[in-house]
Amino acid sequence: MQTTVIGIGETGMGKSSFLNAYLQKNAFQASDSPDSCTKMTSVDSNIINNQTRKAIDTPGIKDTDNTDQENVRQLVEFLLNYADGINVVAIVLNGQVDRYTRDTEKFIKIAHQMFNHPDFWEHLCIIFTKWYSGMNEEQKRIKQEE
């Protein structure tokens, strides 16, 4: 069995880090910087407990390098070929932001339009990242060494 997750969200939210954790390997370049790491939609996979996990990393909306239109165009083009194989749409949000924004609503609407599937809501997952940012320096060092 194969489970495929696509990460969607703003630049700097932790999409690549989340997908690396899901795959249990460093498949995608990730950093704590608010600048974009992901330039193009990319795919990687790993076999964990005899189950194939596939992850799709996407450039962020509000990207620091490309325009939103270019990133959305790139994503739509990619999805035309792969949308049927995606099991989970993960909207990745910064857990330190304490409110729901219009941008969050926009991401969910864009994802819903892109997939245009009657069961979309059953496959949507909201992921909150960056909880570790409240750690002191020693805790961060230990976390990075893990």
Language-model-detected regions and their locations in the chain:
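Conserved GTPase G-domain substructure that encodes guanine base recognition and part of the catalytic core
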Residues: M1-E146
